[in-house]
Curated annotation (Swiss-Prot):
CDD domains: MADS_MEF2_like. This is a truncated version of CAULIFLOWER that may contribute to the 'cauliflower'-shaped floral meristem (curd). This trait has likely been selected by early farmers during the domestication of modified inflorescence structures. It comes from Brassica oleracea var. botrytis. Coiled coil: none annotated. The gene is CAL-B. SUPFAM superfamilies: SRF-like. Keywords: Activator, Coiled coil, Developmental protein, Differentiation, DNA-binding, Flowering, Nucleus, Transcription, Transcription regulation. This is Truncated transcription factor CAULIFLOWER B. Its main location: nucleus.
Length: 150
C-alpha cells in the first residue's frame, strides 16, 4: 500500500532532505534510463545537489554531444523568435557566453574524471570510454618516452 501524496515543500530536516534527495535522485536516474529504453529516446539528465555535486545520465551517446545538440536547437529557436537585429546581437553574445561557459564546465568535469575524481556520477559505458581513452594516452606517452630514451 502506498504512502499517499507528499506535500511539495522544502524538507526542513537536513538529514531527511539528504536521504530524500539520494533516493529520489536514484529513482529519477532510473526513470530516465527506462524512458530511453522503452521509447527509444535520447535522454540526458543533469542534477546538481545542494552542495554542487554533479549527477548525470545520458543514454547511448555521451553528454557532450547531447549538450551541443541542445545548444544548436536552442540557438536556432531563439533566432526564429528574435527579428530585431539588436536583440539578435545581444542574444548571440549571450548564447556564446552560455555555450563557452558550458564547455568550460564540461572540460573541468572531464579533467576531474581523468584524475579519477567524481566517478560516482558516470555510467558504466562512460567509465569504459574513459578507461579506453586513458589506455590510449598511456600508450602514446610510453611510446614517446621510449623514443626519447633510445
Amino acid at each position: 500500500m502506498g504512502r499517499g501524496r507528499v506535500e511539495m515543500k522544502r524538507i526542513e530536516n537536513k538529514i531527511n532532505r539528504q536521504v530524500t534527495f539520494s533516493k529520489r535522485r536514484a529513482g529519477l536516474l532510473k526513470k530516465a534510463h527506462e524512458v530511453s529504453i522503452l521509447c527509444d529516446a535520447e535522454v540526458s539528465l543533469i542534477v546538481f545537489s545542494h552542495k554542487g555535486k554533479l549527477f548525470e545520465y545520458s543514454s547511448e551517446s555521451c553528454m557532450e554531444k547531447v549538450l551541443e545538440r541542445y545548444e544548436r536547437y536552442s540557438y536556432a529557436e531563439k533566432q526564429l523568435k528574435a527579428p530585431d537585429s539588436h536583440v539578435n546581437a545581444q542574444t548571440n553574445w549571450s548564447m556564446e557566453y552560455s555555450r563557452l561557459k558550458a564547455k568550460i564546465e564540461l572540460w573541468e568535469r572531464n579533467q576531474r574524471h581523468y584524475l579519477g575524481e567524481d566517478l560516482e556520477s558516470i555510467s558504466i559505458k562512460e567509465l569504459q570510454n574513459l578507461e579506453q581513452q586513458l589506455d590510449t594516452s598511456l600508450k602514446h606517452i610510453r611510446s614517446r618516452k621510449n623514443q626519447l630514451m633510445h
